[in-house]
């Protein structure tokens, strides 16, 4: 996921990165 994001946004980015 992206660094420097809020927890909720960080998790959302992690899911997008994994996909």
Swiss-Prot record:
Keyword Acyltransferase listed: no
Its biological purpose: Antagonist of L-type calcium channels (Cav1/CACNA1).
GO CC terms of this entry: extracellular region
Protein name (Swiss-Prot/TrEMBL): U7-ctenitoxin-Pn1b
Tissue specificity statement from the Swiss-Prot or TrEMBL entry: Expressed by the venom gland.
Predominant localisation class: secreted
Intracellular or extracellular location(s): Secreted
Keyword flag Repressor: no
GO molecular function: calcium channel regulator activity; toxin activity
Swiss-Prot/TrEMBL keywords: Calcium channel impairing toxin, Ion channel impairing toxin, Neurotoxin, Secreted, Toxin, Voltage-gated calcium channel impairing toxin
């Amino acid at each position: 996921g992206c660094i420097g994001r809020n927890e909720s946004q960080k998790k959302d980015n992690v899911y997008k990165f994994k996909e």
